[in-house]
Curated annotation (Swiss-Prot):
It is a lipid-anchor; GPI-anchor. It comes from Yarrowia lipolytica (strain CLIB 122 / E 150). Binds 1 copper ion per subunit. Residues 239-261 form a propeptide. Disulfide bonds join 39-139, 108-155. GO terms for molecular function: metal ion binding. Residues 180-210 have a biased composition (Low complexity). This is Lytic polysaccharide monooxygenase-like protein X325. Cu(2+) binds at residues 18, 64, 133. It is found in: Cell membrane. Belongs to the X325 family. Glycans are attached at residues 157, 183. Lytic polysaccharide monooxygenase-like protein that has diverged to biological functions other than polysaccharide degradation since it does not perform oxidative cleavage of polysaccharides. Acts as a cell surface-bound protein that functions in the copper-accumulation pathway. A lipid is attached at residue 238 (GPI-anchor amidated asparagine).
Amino acid sequence: MQLSALALATLLATANAHFTVYYPGWRGDSHPTQTQGPCGGLNKIGERFKVNGKSVDVLLKTSHTSAITEYRLCLGDDCGTKSGSDGQKDFSKVLYGPINELGAGNFCMPGLPLGDLKDGQKGTIQVIMQAVDGNLYNCIDFEVDNSVDAFNAVCKNSTGVSAEAISNANAGSLAENTQGSGNSSGHAHGSSGSGSASASKTDSKSSAASGSASATSAAASSAASSAAASASATEEKNSGSLAYVNGALAIGGVVAAALLI
């Protein structure tokens, strides 16, 4: 039996896809080399986007139907300028994850916590997505400007896009396989999902939030369960994105229960 051209194209786009950082922006177009860590094969600092020093919304566009996703941080002027494991050493701090991102389209991580950074501080956020085609990498170079709003209205999920916590996840697992060489030019650039940031509700299938590796505890798990139950009861009344942020349940970009900072 032969596959139709449409079916084959769909299969390739699903099996070998990439992701883009819509907001605040990425180091550069990494599609040809996105399998190369730590920054998708881009070893030169790009445009530094202005972000609030406490938290930042991150909006991704992905064509994967499922991808384990993790966010990491490096502070400094030259983060991620080396290839492979040498460059990955810069990103030792896990901001959030890993979580399981579900559905193709726009995926918003609201209120990604940066701590309490001061004006003028520079750094880079690394996003790793692990899907059927292996690890994919992108980096966000930034400079802190605390006059910038921490929340952005464009950061909303596409219809059908959601995220779920991963119980007992190893926050360092995605970074361990960072490659410094390789060529992903054979990957198809999938385009499924809405290109606009249309609002939708995000389901949460887990009552336990997967916070940063250094902030897991029985008390936090219990509190996260309570937050998830509360959110479930009011889900129909809320619109916008729903995601676990640093152990807290966030709806429409607003942290509902800040459990782990």
